[in-house]
Amino acid sequence: MGKWKVGTRRSKLALTQTNWVVDKLKGFAPEADFELHEIVTKGDRILDVTLSKVGGKGLFVKEIEQSLFDKETDFAVHSLKDMPAELPDGLVIGAIPKRVDPRDVLLSKDGKTLDELPQGALVGTSSLRRSSQILAYRPDIQIESLRGNIDTRMRKLAEGNFDAIILAAAGLERVNFEGEISQFLPVEISLPAVGQGALAIECRADDEETLALLKQFDDAPTRLAVSAERSFLHKLQGGCQVPIGAYATVGENNEITLTGMVGSPDGKQMFKNTATGQDPLALGIQVAEALLAQGAGDVLAEVLRENEQ
């Protein structure tokens, strides 16, 4: 095939990521032509409600996946953290490029770190995972929902609506805003979202030509790490609307170390477990079961009940 149609969200970050992927793929297929198809998702349309209240999984991917099924696109570029743990039948992740920085970062008005923020500081985030962990570390902090693209969030900080906001390092680095970062939050304080810092290139499972192209761009250690994280998420039946975090690293002999967390939205209950192994799927299940044994299931059930109200 000389031409590939590429599905992407319309945001500045999504387009930057997709163009980066296309540039890399041109290295593997110099003669190929790539055509971007910009798609607006449910998560992009509903900006006045926190993600946990919008409900459902795959808020930023469903419409894009439909375009793959309808053969309007051949492959799509996603932030892996936006993807549900289970893909629809007929679709696969054809490539996971090498992960960039997975950490959360703090941006504050005057460069203050999390420890330096004043008592009762107002921090903006729409992520239950982030707010849970920040409140566990600094219970005095006030959390307020913050939705929108990177530019919108940074503008609200600059206008004085917040003392600080929390974003993903990867997104800021991809749009060259690293200079705005006040602090990279250690994973011990804020465990990242499943797959944070990684991209996923999704295509139809029976599209051998596209799979052959994408396979060349797959990073094996990243795939191992995020497979463990996604197995953990799948076992807990979580999406981006629940306070779940996970981060895996791959060492010698493909030994994977996975840490998983579940927290209550107020940060008063925090469950964490770390384990190592070589089978990413088994490891994810093992860490999830350890948290469920500690009582994490009750917290998740309560969050889901609140989201439905």
UniProtKB/Swiss-Prot annotation:
SUPFAM superfamilies: Periplasmic binding protein-like II, Porphobilinogen deaminase (hydroxymethylbilane synthase), C-terminal domain. Its cofactor is dipyrromethane. Keywords: Porphyrin biosynthesis, Transferase. One of its GO terms (cellular component) is cytoplasm. One of its GO terms (molecular function) is hydroxymethylbilane synthase activity. GO terms for biological process: protoporphyrinogen IX biosynthetic process. It catalyses: 4 porphobilinogen + H2O = hydroxymethylbilane + 4 NH4(+). The modification S-(dipyrrolylmethanemethyl)cysteine is found at residue 240. Pathway: Porphyrin-containing compound metabolism; protoporphyrin-IX biosynthesis; coproporphyrinogen-III from 5-aminolevulinate: step 2/4. Transmembrane segments: none annotated. Its EC number is 2.5.1.61. Binds 1 dipyrromethane group covalently. Belongs to the HMBS family. The porphobilinogen subunits are added to the dipyrromethane group. Tetrapolymerization of the monopyrrole PBG into the hydroxymethylbilane pre-uroporphyrinogen in several discrete steps. HAMAP family: Porphobil_deam. Monomer. This is Porphobilinogen deaminase.
